[in-house]
């Protein structure tokens, strides 16, 4: 949305006049979005808002809060955004859901959150009981908010304190999902913790798993390597009969990459249709690269499907 304000107003008025509108997709290009009157819309089933704009919380979240409350059939919500003007522009999942009647919760099946404060409690949990797909990236944790408080003026610090109460750590989110027995079929995340592995080890039936920038919190390589071994040896086999997509993109070579330590576990995943994984260069004999590639590919060539491989 980089059009002049008058054009944005015309577009929003036109959208509001479409009674059968169910799927809304908006890409913010960095320009002001004060004319984005999401509160004018109702009864949507899918909402996707990507990109960024100044005053995101004021111009987007406030209207989105009303739109969600007026869309009881909403099943798909994608509200990832890439940047914010300042720390006060942080938004929370509570800010989206607290207008929805508790006795008539949403039936969300697909949720994408990027750069949000997330806390799963009596306000937010009812709306994700039926969730099947979750993408959780750049989760804003309480300590990130706290680190800004000391440097801010008292009024700003008080605002940040209120925001922090709607944040929880990534580990707390996965622990709550496990305790509430919410069994996701599709997961995409960028932080791997013991709590995450405990969650996906608590059930079977995962179909799509994407792990990006796979590393441990605090950039502890040793811890990350231990988590990788646990994932391949103990967790992945739990979903070997259901997994169709596995995408693992670590930030450095190590145990998350393909090698002799995880080949057996990967070969158990007989329903894989899409596999993307890095290969440890230290395990490749340069003069025999073609032999190494064949050794990686051969177990997958005999699967019932013809999987897409990205190595």
Residue ranges and their predicted role:
Residues 1-311:
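Leucine-rich repeat
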């Amino acid at each position: 949305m980089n059009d002049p304000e008058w054009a944005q107003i015309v577009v929003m008025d036109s959208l509001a006049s479409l009674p059968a509108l169910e799927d809304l997709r908006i890409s913010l290009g960095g320009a002001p979005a004060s004319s984005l009157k999401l509160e004018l819309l109702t009864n949507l089933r899918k909402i996707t808002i990507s990109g960024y704009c100044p005053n995101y919380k004021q111009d987007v979240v406030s209207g989105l809060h009303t739109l969600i409350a007026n869309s009881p059939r909403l099943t798909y919500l994608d509200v990832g955004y890439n940047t914010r003007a300042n720390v006060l522009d942080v938004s929370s999942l509570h800010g989206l859901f607290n207008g929805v009647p508790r006795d008539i919760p949403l039936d969300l099946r697909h949720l994408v959150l990027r750069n949000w404060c997330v806390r799963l409690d009596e306000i937010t949990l009812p709306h994700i009981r039926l969730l099947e797909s979750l993408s959780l990236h750049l989760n804003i944790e309480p300590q990130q908010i706290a680190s800004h408080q000391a440097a801010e003026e008292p009024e700003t610090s008080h605002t940040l304190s209120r925001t922090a109460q709607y944040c929880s750590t990534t580990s707390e989110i996965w622990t709550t999902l496990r305790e509430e027995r919410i069994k996701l079929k599709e997961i995409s995340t960028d932080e791997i913790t013991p709590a995450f592995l405990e969650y996906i080890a608590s059930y079977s039936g995962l179909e799509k798993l994407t792990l990006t920038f796979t590393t441990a919190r605090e950039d502890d390589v040793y811890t990350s390597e231990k988590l990788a071994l646990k994932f391949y040896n103990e967790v992945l086999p739990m979903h070997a009969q259901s997994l169709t997509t596995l995408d693992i993109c670590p930030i450095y070579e190590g145990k998350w990459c393909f090698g002799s330590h995880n080949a057996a576990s990967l070969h158990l995943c007989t329903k894989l249709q899409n596999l993307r994984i890095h290969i440890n260069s230290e395990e490749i004999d340069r003069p025999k690269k073609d032999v190494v590639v064949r050794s990686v590919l051969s177990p997958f060539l005999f699967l019932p499907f013809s999987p897409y491989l990205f190595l």
